[in-house]
């Protein structure tokens, strides 16, 4: 029996417990009431009386060895389980919503505008946002002392000789000048981009905004062609039931000139603070390209004619989505921008 006890003790010492399954197997084999150790205790009655005390002592040592190993393994595995649990994802917790980004409403509407005019045959031209006085004013029929310059409050960057002042462009019309200087007619382009004006910030105006201008030069182009283009654009942009009105206006670079209005989207024409109680909102200016502008770009106005138009993209965004404050488009308020997430 002594050999059996010593062999079993060595077996217990060598038993590797690394998992909960190993622990349970050890317990069932050695320490339960029907385990190997309990079975040996049951065999003590068959041992010679003189050997019983010594065999009993060996069995007690065997049981202590097994119990100690079992306790140590339980504590070790419990610590490992606790550490593992602290890093484990609790699947019962409510999920966290991750918001995906989306296209800004200004860029979305600008993309639609580009698509509409591209379908009409217009190309796309861009130019620098930092311009000279010559491109921004002089070549567009704004003489240095002409009062029309007061219509566009300008951010000047540097000031030098007349015509060479560097400024932030007040419209994308300088891009049209560059196109007319670089290309020969016929010309059909749109010019999207950011523009800057030193204006008071309000619900209807901002110091920086997005503009899209168009230019078409060919032979025998008329004001009727201009109206047809604008009506076609408006119906695709605002819906087939859109109402427009043309008002006579003045721009140094077009003659005749007009402004185009649509019915106020908030009040339906009844009058509100957004439309200044008029019931109408201006969406663009337009007109026939002034002969002086053509001459400045080396184009003969006796042979060629054309029209131009320009609109605020941000104003169109307000119309499309019924937003009553243009400042919301520039403040990066996620509460507003998340509404445009697809």
Swiss-Prot record:
It is found in: Cytoplasm. GO terms for cellular component: cytoplasm. It comes from the Bacteria. It catalyses: tRNA(Phe) + L-phenylalanine + ATP = L-phenylalanyl-tRNA(Phe) + AMP + diphosphate + H(+). Its main location: cytoplasm. Its cofactor is Mg(2+). It is an enzyme of class 6 (ligase). It holds the Pfam family Phe_tRNA-synt_N. Transmembrane segments: none annotated. Binds 2 magnesium ions per tetramer. Signal peptide: none annotated. One of its GO terms (molecular function) is ATP binding. Its EC number is 6.1.1.20. Mg(2+) binds at residue 255. Keywords: Aminoacyl-tRNA synthetase, ATP-binding, Cytoplasm, Ligase, Magnesium, Metal-binding, Nucleotide-binding, Protein biosynthesis. GO terms for biological process: phenylalanyl-tRNA aminoacylation. PANTHER family: PHENYLALANINE--TRNA LIGASE, MITOCHONDRIAL, PHENYLALANYL-TRNA SYNTHETASE. Tetramer of two alpha and two beta subunits. Belongs to the class-II aminoacyl-tRNA synthetase family. Phe-tRNA synthetase alpha subunit type 1 subfamily. This is Phenylalanine--tRNA ligase alpha subunit. It comes from Pelodictyon phaeoclathratiforme (strain DSM 5477 / BU-1). The gene is pheS.
């Amino acid at each position: 029996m002594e050999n059996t006890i010593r062999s079993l003790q060595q077996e217990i010492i060598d038993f590797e417990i690394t998992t909960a399954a190993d622990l349970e197997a050890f317990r069932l084999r050695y320490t339960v009431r029907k385990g190997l150790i309990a079975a040996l205790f049951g065999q003590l009655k068959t041992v010679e009386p003189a050997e019983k005390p010594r065999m009993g002592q060996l069995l007690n040592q065997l049981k202590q060895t097994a119990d100690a190993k079992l306790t140590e393994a339980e504590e070790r595995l419990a610590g490992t389980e606790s550490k593992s649990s602290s890093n484990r994802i609790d699947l019962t917790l409510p999920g966290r919503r991750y918001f995906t980004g989306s296209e800004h409403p200004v860029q979305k509407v600008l993309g639609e505008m580009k698509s509409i005019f591209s379908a009409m045959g217009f190309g796309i031209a861009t130019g620098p946002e930092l311009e000279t006085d010559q491109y921004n004013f002089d070549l567009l029929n704004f003489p240095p002392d002409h009062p029309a310059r007061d219509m566009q409050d300008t951010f000047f960057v540097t000031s030098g000789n007349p015509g060479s002042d560097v400024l932030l462009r007040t419209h994308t019309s300088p891009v049209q000048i560059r196109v007319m200087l670089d290309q020969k007619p016929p010309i059909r382009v749109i010019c999207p981009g950011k523009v800057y004006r030193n204006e008071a910030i309000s619900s209807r105006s901002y110091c920086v905004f997005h503009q899209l201008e168009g230019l078409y030069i060919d032979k025998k182009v008329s004001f009727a062609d201009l109206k047809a283009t604008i009506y076609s654009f408006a119906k695709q942009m605002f819906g087939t039931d859109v109402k427009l009105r043309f008002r006579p206006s003045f721009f140094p670079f077009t003659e005749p000139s007009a402004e185009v209005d649509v019915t106020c989207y908030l009040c339906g024409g009844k009058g509100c603070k957004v439309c200044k109680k008029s019931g109408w909102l201006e969406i663009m200016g337009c007109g026939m390209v002034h002969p002086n502008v053509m001459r400045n770009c080396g184009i003969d106005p006796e042979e060629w004619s054309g029209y131009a138009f320009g609109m605020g993209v941000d104003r169109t965004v307000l119309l499309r989505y019924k937003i009553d404050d243009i400042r919301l488009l520039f403040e990066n308020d996620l509460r507003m921008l998340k509404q445009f997430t697809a």
